[in-house]
């Protein structure tokens, strides 16, 4: 019933747009593509030597752009670009744009261009959430430089995600793993930011609401999946980051915004209770015996920094925690730009020890991406 109501509200929203109420359809947002206001936050103004978002972001972005495609560095290589690279690439692009580093932007775009030519076989087919998220990169390039070839590729992938939807309007890629709440959102919201077409926002919002109804628990946190009752750190990070990206672009009068914003605030309030003294969060958020994990910490930092600066969260309560999260995170970035204590790739499993004993990787792009998102958030 909730999904039917969501569909009806989505149709109403589309009709309002068609007659000019609530915004002008088909008008791409600005390069900064979000409607939240930039707020001065004293906790984000000064940083100890070697910890500024400019310095850390540059180091991590350089480490990324100097490396070969991640899928080709694996043994054996995987056939197409994989999502940790997509998330890092997107973060590096936003960081370069916000710092005015045109040389870095050019290198990031040059890294992409072979995928439009002789290495096109590395572009993943949009048949799974982890593949379709690839759209976020060409769409971000288009937002920044307005070259149509990037738009055509990105919107083609985003459109195919809804080519044959379920009867309730959800994408057929829906699987109710919390990871999806970022993967689906990134592709669809970036398509909106590039085109101004509200259908992409409606896709992302409808999907987000369905996942919120299914996976958010009374304490505000999220199970990895309906049958896996654990509060996995990075999984919850994907949710926090996905809601944040959606809220950055979702208009104040969109019918699904209140539910999504309330869910975001409920989650962030819960996270405050579980933050470690050094600013990190654990591999299993509510397990003190679990180890501090950096990819989740970076994602929560991104969500919290953005919420404070956008006015979604109380500044007095959350700004100190967001600062502590950033400083706790950068402690794990080495001189080469590699991040340690990153949980390895993790499928869902109803087994506590499975989560507690995951490998702690160094140099894993799962950990580098959210550092770039957080650095970008601090610079917006």
Q: Where in this protein do the model-derived segments appear?
A:
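N-terminal secretory signal peptides that target proteins for export/translocation
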Residues: 1-7
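Extended ligand-binding clefts on enzyme/binding-domain cores
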Residues: 178-179, 189-284, 290-301, 313-347, ...
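CBM-like carbohydrate-recognition segments
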Residues: 33-86, 98-114, 118-135, 141-144, ...
């Amino acid at each position: 019933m909730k999904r039917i109501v969501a569909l009806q509200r989505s149709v109403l929203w589309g009709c309002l747009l068609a007659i000019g109420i609530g915004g002008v359809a088909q008008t791409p947002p600005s390069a900064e593509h979000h409607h939240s206001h930039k707020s001065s936050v004293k906790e984000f103004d000064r940083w100890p030597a070697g910890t500024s978002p400019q310095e850390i972001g540059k180091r991590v972005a350089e480490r990324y752009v100097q490396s070969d495609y991640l899928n080709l560095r694996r043994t054996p290589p995987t056939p197409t670009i994989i999502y940790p690279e997509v998330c890092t690439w997107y973060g590096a692009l936003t960081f370069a744009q916000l710092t005015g580093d045109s040389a870095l932007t050019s290198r990031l775009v040059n890294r992409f261009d072979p995928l439009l030519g002789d290495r096109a076989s590395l572009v993943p087919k949009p048949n799974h959430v982890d593949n379709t998220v690839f759209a976020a990169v060409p769409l971000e390039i288009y937002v920044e430089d307005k070259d149509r070839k990037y738009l055509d590729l990105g919107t083609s992938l985003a459109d195919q995600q809804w080519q044959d939807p379920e009867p309730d309007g959800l994408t057929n890629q829906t699987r109710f793993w919390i990871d999806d709440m970022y993967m689906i959102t990134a592709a669809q919201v970036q398509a909106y930011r590039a085109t101004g077409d509200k259908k992409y926002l409606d896709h992302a919002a409808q999907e987000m609401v369905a996942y919120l109804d299914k996976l958010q628990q009374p304490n505000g946190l999220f199970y990895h999946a309906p049958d896996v009752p654990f509060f996995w750190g990075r999984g919850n990070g994907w949710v926090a980051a996905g809601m944040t990206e959606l809220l950055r672009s979702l208009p104040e009068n969109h019918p699904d915004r209140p539910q999504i914003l309330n869910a975001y605030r409920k989650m962030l309030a819960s996270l405050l209770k579980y933050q470690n003294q050094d600013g990190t969060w654990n591999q299993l958020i509510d397990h003190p015996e679990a180890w501090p994990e950096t990819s989740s910490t970076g994602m929560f930092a991104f969500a919290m920094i953005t919420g404070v600066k956008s006015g979604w969260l109380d500044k007095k309560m959350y700004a100190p925690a967001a600062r502590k999260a950033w400083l706790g995170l950068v402690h794990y970035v080495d001189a080469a730009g590699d991040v340690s204590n990153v949980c390895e790739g993790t499928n869902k499993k109803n087994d506590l020890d499975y989560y507690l004993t995951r490998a702690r990787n160094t140099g894993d792009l799962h950990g580098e991406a959210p550092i770039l998102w957080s650095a970008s958030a601090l610079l917006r």
